[in-house]
């Protein structure tokens, strides 16, 4: 038993030694890892074996994959990549075919569009030439019309003179026939038809009163200018360049983009010189000098000059009635600035009075109260459109003498009337005594005739200019002779020009004082508290006249979803016939409604039904948010501004005392922005019962579900008149002063 055990131990030790040491086979390289050598019987089955075990270092000898398995894996991967490459090649081929197809379609499209684009370009050029030629012909026609109108006027004057001559001849014949009675062989009973001549004269007067100078004669035609649109200033390396194939197919190299500009020339206006500013369009400039001779006698005195003109307008109208033509005469007498000229009533016609002197300006109101506003230290220059001659006035104070610049003297040598009167010994009672001076004024008498439109214009002018530096204690009696007789007669067209260029404070002032104020149209006004002259549309045909258009919507051509500054300044425009869309501007509306003002809202739906609403309104300042004060509703449209929308509650929809809101300045009472949601600036509450500045929807009814981005009734609405989903066709807002009603 023991030997067997010893034998087993020795055998184990031998095996362990053999395991630790390398054999000769391994030393010769036979121990390297590699594919197992398989018998022929296993070659056919290795391709189909799928569940190969995982090979690790410990199991390399029994589980290592054979070369057959590795070759299969390589073949599968190669086949996969080959399929991918074939797929990519197929997609490239398809894209190339599509590219060729798209190029062919582009070429066909270009060939179709190119003739049309070239034809359109030619039409644009022809349109520019035709419009230029048309404008030239219109200007020629206007000149011919003006020539024909002058010929018609000359013929009217000739016919009138012939009628007068015929009447005179008939009267002479009647006198001779009457003188022949008793001494002639025959006698005739001849009577002059005086009534017939009077009717002819009235008809001629009525014909001459027709205005044959239409409005377009006084306006300058706009000029249509077409010029090529300049290319952008972007550098070339930032621009996308087409491929060489597409460059050959470019059809727009010869097509030029044209910019069409309609230039409207600015209308000339008469500038009024004030202070140290230089006058424009003037024929005479009157300046003043300030000197102090003696501090003890004439301290705080100065001399200034001003021109005050009063115009008397006599309008004759011939009205045909059942009893025959009858004549109406309307006489007005106002100054160019709208002040009272009643103190000049009863003056002698054909004279111009020049008053000169120095002293405290406030003392002049004893003689001429209206002149106080003219004698100010800040206003030392005035302008006049008359063509005036020149004269020199001499002034003597004490032992010295001085000569001041040129004054003005009207000369009418063709009338044969010219005289000079010396008023040096006169001193108005309003000046204090203390220093002596001598002044010389020129009184020029004139007479001429001017008739336009059947109306005769007579002018009375009060001109004051500096003729002495001091006016002191010249002793004279205090009788009525100290005040000269203010009488003048003038038919010069300058008076008419002054009236035509009159800038009123509102349309009601224009209606009363402007020559063409009785007609609706574009006029220039200067609101109280503003130095800016506005061009506004005045409606003189609606009840009482004097309505100033501040808002209008009629075709949706103007976007009313504007900023606060846009609504402050105003936007849009209307033509001379009142066509167009505009917002006059919150600042201008505030200036025009500082006093109680009547607001008239006119509405029209798409069926032609009209309604109106009138209120008494005031609009606050910008610091107050242009708050709307509104009351006293009258009309047929329903009270939307004060009462609001009764179904939603007046406290939420009334616009009274509300501030103006725009999408960039939210001043409403809603937690969100009403102006942003409803698409326009307005006096929102929470939010509205009326909004005349909303989105303009043609056709009337609209579905708010399709409104983007807010599905809400945001049209031009006046809910008491039409439903909230009905957008009105025409809306207008007009104002006029309440005090003139």
Curated annotation (Swiss-Prot):
- Main location per the UniProt record: secreted
Q: Which UniProt keywords apply?
A: Blood coagulation, Calcium, Coiled coil, Disulfide bond, Hemostasis, Metal-binding, Pyrrolidone carboxylic acid, Secreted, Signal
Tell me where in or outside the cell this protein is found.
Secreted
Q: List the disulfide bonds.
A: 310-341, 674-687
Q: Which InterPro entries match?
A: FIB_ANG-like, Fibrinogen-like_C, Fibrinogen_a/b/g_C_1, Fibrinogen_a/b/g_C_dom, Fibrinogen_a/b/g_coil_dom, Fibrinogen_aC, Fibrinogen_CS
**Site annotation Cleavage: residues:** 33-34
Q: Which residues form the signal peptide?
A: 1-18
Q: Where does Ca(2+) bind?
A: 666, 668, 670, 672
Report one GO cellular component: fibrinogen complex
Q: What does this protein do?
A: Cleaved by the protease thrombin to yield monomers which, together with fibrinogen beta (FGB) and fibrinogen gamma (FGG), polymerize to form an insoluble fibrin matrix. Fibrin has a major function in hemostasis as one of the primary components of blood clots.
Protein name (record) = Fibrinogen alpha chain
Organism name: Gallus gallus (Chicken)
Gene from which this protein is expressed = FGA
């Amino acid at each position: 038993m023991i030997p067997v055990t010893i034998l087993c131990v020795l055998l184990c030790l031998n095996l362990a030694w053999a395991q630790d040491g390398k054999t000769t086979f391994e030393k010769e390289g036979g121990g390297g890892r590699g594919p197992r050598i398989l018998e022929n019987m296993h070659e056919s089955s290795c391709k189909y074996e799928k569940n190969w075990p995982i090979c690790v270092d410990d199991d390399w000898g029994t589980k290592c994959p054979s070369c057959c398995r590795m070759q299969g894996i390589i073949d599968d991967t190669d086949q996969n990549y080959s399929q991918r490459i074939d797929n990519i090649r197929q997609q490239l081929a398809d894209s190339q075919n599509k590219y060729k197809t798209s190029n062919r379609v582009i070429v066909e499209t270009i060939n179709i569009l190119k003739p049309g684009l070239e034809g359109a370009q030619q039409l644009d050029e022809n349109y520019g030439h035709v419009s230029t030629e048309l404008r030239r012909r219109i200007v020629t026609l206007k000149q011919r019309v003006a020539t024909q109108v002058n010929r018609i006027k000359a013929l009217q004057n000739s016919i009138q003179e012939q009628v007068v001559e015929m009447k005179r001849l008939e009267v002479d014949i009647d006198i001779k026939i009457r003188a022949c009675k008793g001494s002639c062989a025959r006698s005739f009973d001849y009577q002059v038809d005086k009534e017939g001549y009077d009717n002819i004269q009235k008809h001629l007067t009525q014909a001459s009163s027709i205005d044959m100078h239409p409005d377009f004669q006084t306006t300058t035609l706009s000029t249509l200018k077409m010029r090529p649109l300049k290319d952008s200033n972007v550098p070339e390396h930032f621009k996308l360049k087409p491929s060489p194939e597409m460059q050959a197919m470019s059809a727009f190299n010869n097509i030029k983009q044209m910019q069409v500009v309609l230039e409207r020339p600015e209308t000339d206006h008469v500038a009024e010189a004030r202070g140290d500013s230089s006058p424009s369009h003037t024929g005479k400039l009157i300046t003043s000098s300030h000197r102090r001779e003696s501090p003890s006698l004439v301290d705080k005195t100065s001399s200034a000059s001003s021109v005050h003109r009063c115009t008397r307008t006599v309008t004759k109208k011939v009205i045909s009635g059942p009893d025959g033509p009858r004549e109406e005469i309307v006489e007005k007498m106002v100054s160019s600035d709208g002040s009272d000229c009643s103190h000049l009533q009863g003056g002698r016609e054909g004279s111009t009075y020049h008053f000169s002197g120095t002293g405290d300006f406030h003392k002049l109101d004893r003689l001429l109260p209206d002149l106080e506003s003219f004698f100010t230290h800040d206003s030392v220059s005035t302008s006049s459109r008359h063509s005036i001659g020149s004269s020199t006035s001499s002034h003597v104070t004490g032992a010295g003498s001085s000569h001041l610049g040129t004054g003005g003297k009207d000369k009418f040598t063709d009338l044969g009337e010219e005289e000079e009167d010396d008023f040096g010994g006169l001193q108005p009672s309003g000046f204090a005594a203390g220093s002596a001076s001598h002044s010389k004024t020129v009184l020029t008498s004139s007479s001429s005739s001017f008739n336009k439109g059947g109306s005769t214009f007579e002018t009375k002018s009060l001109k004051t200019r500096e003729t002495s530096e001091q006016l002191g204690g010249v002793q004279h009696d205090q009788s009525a002779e100290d005040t000269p007789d203010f009488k003048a007669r003038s038919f010069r067209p300058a008076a008419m020009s002054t009236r035509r260029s009159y800038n009123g404070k509102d349309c009601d002032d224009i209606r009363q004082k402007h020559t063409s104020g009785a007609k609706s149209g574009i006029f220039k006004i200067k609101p109280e508290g503003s130095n800016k002259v506005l061009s506004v549309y005045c409606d003189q045909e609606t009840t009482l006249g004097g309505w100033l258009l501040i808002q209008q919507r009629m075709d949706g051509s103007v976007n009313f979803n504007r900023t606060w500054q846009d609504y402050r300044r105003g936007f849009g425009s209307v033509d001379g016939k009142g066509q167009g869309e505009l917002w006059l501007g919150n600042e201008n509306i505030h200036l025009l409604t500082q006093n109680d003002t009547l607001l008239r809202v006119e509405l029209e739906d798409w069926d032609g039904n009209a309604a109106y609403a009138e209120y008494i309104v005031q609009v606050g300042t910008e610091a107050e948010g242009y708050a709307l004060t509104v009351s006293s509703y009258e009309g047929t449209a329903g009270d939307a501004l004060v009462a609001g929308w009764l179904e939603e509650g007046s406290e939420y929809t009334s616009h009274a005392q509300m501030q103006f809101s725009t999408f960039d300045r939210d001043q409403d009472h809603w937690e969100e922005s009403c102006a942003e949601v409803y698409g326009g600036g307005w006096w929102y509450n929470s939010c509205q019962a009326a909004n005349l500045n909303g989105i303009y929807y043609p056709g009337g009814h609209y579905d708010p579900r399709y409104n983007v981005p807010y599905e809400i009734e945001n049209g031009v609405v006046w809910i008491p008149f039409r439903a909230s989903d009905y957008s009105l066709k025409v809306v207008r807002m007009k104002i006029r002063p309440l005090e003139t009603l």
